[in-house]
Amino acid sequence: MNGLPSTEAPGGAGCALAGLPPLPRGLSGLLNASGGSWRELERVYSQRSRIHDELSRAARAPDGPRHAAGSANLGSAAGPRRPVNLDSALAALRKEMVGLRQLDMSLLCQLWGLYESIQDYKHLCQDLSLCQDLSSSLHSDSSYPPDAGLSDDDEPPDASLPPDPPPLTVPQTHNARDQWLQDAFQISL
């Protein structure tokens, strides 16, 4: 109804987008009723306020129509147990929202950690590639002059050149997240 693809959740809990958990029970009816427009949302809010006022008046007058019908019929006529008033419904919604906020923050932290790990891994691969390119260019045969017909008695040609640099290694990080990536992809560095 709001223009988004939705599927009905089991048990009629409301609409859920593909790949996302279903909406909290307290919001699903509001979203379906609003149709996505703010004017409709205002209308629903005023209707909810009117219902809250009626519930408050009914709670203050125990001899109202609900009480006259008898307590035996009250449970069967109401169907599934629902919150008695708007305050308890809001408290239940608040609890659900806190849980969703905690889940959201947890997922956000995990995504951020994964993003950082991917960036670290990219930099590590780039550094390794750069080191390998540099090492191969230093040790390639074309970078050294060929033997100029020297005899065994002459000084070796490497004596005039500086000694070979130590082999280049990628610095090892001490981050558990990087270790997890190396273990997960079985990369030997």
UniProtKB/Swiss-Prot annotation:
Residues 68-79 have a biased composition (Low complexity). The modification Phosphoserine is found at residues 28, 188. It comes from the Eukaryota. InterPro entries: LURA1/LRA25 (IPR039499). One of its GO terms (molecular function) is transcription corepressor binding. Keywords: Cell projection, Cytoplasm, Leucine-rich repeat, Phosphoprotein, Receptor, Repeat. It is found in: Cytoplasm; Cell projection, Lamellipodium. Residues 55-81, 141-174 are annotated as: Disordered. Residues 159-169 have a biased composition (Pro residues). One of its GO terms (cellular component) is lamellipodium. Its main location: cytoplasm. GO terms for biological process: establishment of cell polarity; negative regulation of SMAD protein signal transduction; negative regulation of transforming growth factor beta receptor signaling pathway; positive regulation of cell migration. LRR repeats lie at residues 86-114. Interacts with SKI. Interacts (via LRR repeat) with CDC42BPA (via AGC-kinase C-terminal domain) and CDC42BPB (via AGC-kinase C-terminal domain). Interacts (via LRR repeat) with LIMK1 (via LIM zinc-binding domains). Forms a tripartite complex with CDC42BPA, CDC42BPB and LIMK1. Negatively regulates TGF-beta-induced signaling; in cooperation with SKI prevents the translocation of SMAD2 from the nucleus to the cytoplasm in response to TGF-beta. Acts as an adapter that mediates the specific recognition of LIMK1 by CDC42BPA and CDC42BPB in the lamellipodia. LRAP25-mediated CDC42BPA/CDC42BPB targeting to LIMK1 and the lamellipodium results in LIMK1 activation and the subsequent phosphorylation of CFL1 which is important for lamellipodial F-actin regulation. Belongs to the FAM89 family. This is Leucine repeat adapter protein 25. The lineage of its organism: Eukaryota, Metazoa, Chordata, Craniata, Vertebrata.
